[in-house]
Each structure stands twice: as structure tokens, then as C-alpha cells.
A protein has these predicted regions:
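N-terminal hydrophobic targeting/anchoring segments and the immediately downstream early-domain regions
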Residues: 5-23, 28-177, 232-376
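Active-site core of metal-dependent hydrolases
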Residues: 170-264
Length: 376
């Protein structure tokens, strides 16, 4: 230290000494900004329209009852409610619904099942994580539309019409034929509208997305996707699709996936902010939200996780449902923590968005539209 100091000239020393008061003055300002962001996040209804309290995408840690680390992440997340995927085949879907209802019964101070709109505000008040049970496919109903009624009674409130491939309802985003909504699909949408189940078009192909928007009498949702104009990716949506969705009162949830910007590395906060900026420009401030597509617990890139991640991607490729960029890290490193949506607040504040707009994007818009959708 003394040797380094001896090389500083008087002029340099004076400059450093003069800067010291400025640095000292800046520290409280930075702290105040951090407190303001934390306060805004803490008092807002925060909704992640695709997340999971356990493992998400990659099955590591192994799926099952919540671990202590996963429960700690839920407590610290500050998230009010999430759309948690329970879809599988018929038996698997019933089993997954029972699993999460069992976890909510086991940890009532931590989790609650969202069945009606008022349950979201109750989750905020009671400081529980509200679980909105949802499907990312319609395979479990096969061609029996009455199963929608059964699953509604079991607690399903959000249903994505297709995954990446084709089913009886329509075409997913990786289907080259790009067929639209089938006649059965139109009947499914009508029944979902009547029951009060949200129509989700996130993974749907371009034509099925357009048809789903047109067919739905209730606001259609795109719970976890992005803007194709910002980064060309089949899992994201064209501006015309986003405008049509917003025109029907729907909301887009911007995801945190590597599909938001160019690789080969991990996605970044800047990429996410560009997506949010563009979505607001195209859709308007009342039609943009968050759908991270992540677990509430941070991803730890252990050898076990990396092994399972490779198996996950390889398995999807063999089934023909793997999207481009899936070999990249499936998370934003700077936001790889339970309070990741607080990072969105910080990023939007740095971009000079107002408090009102930030509150809408981190949960207010989805909270509003779900009231309209779930009122049968």
C-alpha cells in the first residue's frame, strides 16, 4: 500500500481527495434507490405467469415433495402467485394436481391454491405463494371435451392449447404445416370461455395463435413468450400477433429464456429489458407482464444439473419438440435468485418507467385480466 501511494502525484492525490465527498454523497443515494425498488416490489402484487416452486424444465433437483431449500426460496421470493404447470397424460395430470394440493395442505403458511380471483389478493395478504394450476397442452382431454369440466372442478384455471407440436386442438410453433385451430379446438376454446379457464397461446403456431385470439370471447393470454421482432425465434410472437392479442384485452408474459436474444452464451438483463421495451411499444402498458419459465429456486450448475440438462435437451430433440437455443443456459445469471422479478423493477426504473407502469408489468396486468377471464 505504501509503495503504491508513493507513486501518486500531488495533483492525483488532490483529485482523489476531492472525489471522496462525492462518493460519500452518492452512497446514500444508491441505498435510497435500492430501498425504493425493494419497497415498490414488496407492496405490489407480483405474478409470474409460468414458474414452479420445485424443479422447472430440467429435473434437478429430482421432482417430488418440496425440499427445505425450495421452501426457503419461496419465502424469500416476494412473488404473490404463479402459473404452475401440472400437465401430463390424463393420469399424470390428476396425480400432479393432487401433488400440489397436497403440498399446499402440508405447508398452509407457505402455499395456497388459487381457485378464484380473490385468492390472489388473499395470497398477498397472507404472504403465501398462490398456485394457479395450469396445463401446457390439451393432450389430457384427448377428444373428450367434458374433461375440461372435470379438470376445472379439480382446480385448473389456465390451459395452453398446444405445446410445440400438433394435437387435436391445433398446431404448435414447431409444426412446419402451420395449420390453424381445428373445429374441435374451437369447441375447446368456447368451453374454456364458458367455464372461466384462461386460453393460453404461448407455444401455439402462428395460425393457431391467430385463430385462438379470434375465437376467444374472453381475453386471450400469451403467458410465457417474447417478441420475434427483437430476436427471431419460433417460440416468440410476431408483432401482428401481439397487437391482435392486446386488441382483445389479453396480456403477454415475457419469458427469461435464452430465446430472448442472440447467443451462444446465457441471456442477459439487457436482452430482457429490450423485450419488455418492445412489448410495451407494440402492446401498450396494459398488456405486458412476466412469465419467466423458471423455478423460484436458483439454478445451481452442479455436475448433476448439467448431466440432467443435457438429457433434457437430448430427449426433447428425439421427440421433435426441442426449440432452437435450448442448449444455452436456461436462465439469466444476473437474475438467478428467488427475487428475480425485483430485478425487473430495477431495470425498468433505470429505464425511467413510472411506478404505475412497473406495477402493471410485474403483476397488475395479469391480476386485472384474470378477473375478467375467471368471471363465468
Amino acid at each position: 500500500m505504501t509503495q503504491t501511494l508513493s507513486r501518486i502525484t500531488r495533483r492525483e492525490f488532490a483529485a482523489i481527495a476531492g472525489a471522496a465527498p462525492l462518493l460519500a454523497a452518492a452512497a446514500p443515494t444508491l441505498a435510497a434507490r435500492q430501498d425504493e425498488v425493494a419497497g415498490l416490489y414488496g407492496r405490489s402484487i407480483v405474478i409470474d405467469m409460468l414458474a414452479n416452486p420445485g424443479s422447472m424444465n430440467v429435473s434437478w433437483p429430482p421432482r417430488g415433495p418440496l425440499s427445505e431449500k425450495q421452501r426457503d426460496a419461496i419465502r424469500s421470493s416476494g412473488i404473490t402467485a404463479i402459473n404452475v404447470t401440472v400437465s401430463s397424460d390424463f393420469e399424470g395430470s390428476v396425480r400432479n394436481i393432487a401433488l400440489w394440493q397436497g403440498e399446499a395442505d402440508r405447508y398452509p403458511e407457505l402455499l395456497s391454491i388459487v381457485r378464484r380471483h380473490s385468492d390472489i389478493a388473499a395470497a398477498k395478504q397472507n404472504k403465501t405463494l398462490g398456485l394457479m394450476l395450469g396445463f401446457q397442452n390439451t393432450d389430457m382431454i384427448d377428444r373428450d371435451i367434458t374433461r375440461l369440466d372435470m379438470f376445472y372442478r379439480l382446480g385448473i384455471r389456465i390451459v395452453q392449447l398446444t405445446y410445440n407440436d400438433r394435437n387435436y386442438v391445433g398446431d404448435g410453433c414447431l409444426e412446419q404445416a402451420n395449420g390453424g385451430l381445428s373445429q374441435f379446438g374451437r369447441e375447446v376454446v368456447a368451453r374454456m370461455n364458458a367455464l372461466g379457464i384462461a386460453v393460453d397461446l404461448s407455444h401455439c403456431g402462428t395460425q393457431t395463435t391467430a385463430d385462438g385470439i379470434a375465437a376467444s370471447a374472453k381475453p386471450p393470454l400469451i403467458t410465457h413468450s417474447g417478441c420475434r421482432e427483437v430476436y427471431r425465434h419460433p417460440r416468440s410472437k410476431e408483432d401482428r400477433e401481439l397487437k391482435a392479442m392486446a386488441g382483445k384485452g389479453g396480456v403477454l408474459g415475457v419469458y427469461f429464456m435464452p430465446f430472448i436474444g442472440p447467443g451462444p452464451g446465457a441471456p442477459t438483463v439487457e436482452m430482457l429489458m429490450r423485450q419488455i421495451d418492445h412489448a410495451i411499444k407494440v402492446c401498450g402498458v396494459d398488456h405486458v407482464g412476466i412469465g419467466s419459465d423458471l423455478s423460484t429456486m436458483p439454478i445451481e450448475e452442479t455436475p448433476e444439473y448439467l448431466r440432467e440438462a443435457k438429457a433434457f435437451v437430448d430427449g426433447r430433440a428425439k421427440r421433435g419438440i426441442a426449440a432452437p437455443d435450448e442448449t444455452r443456459p436456461l436462465f439469466i445469471p444476473e437474475l438467478n435468485h428467488p427475487r428475480r422479478i425485483e430485478g425487473v423493477v430495477r431495470g425498468m426504473r433505470q429505464r425511467k418507467y413510472s411506478t404505475e407502469v412497473i406495477e402493471k408489468v410485474i403483476g397488475g396486468n395479469f391480476h386485472r385480466v384474470l378477473k375478467e377471464i375467471w368471471t363465468s
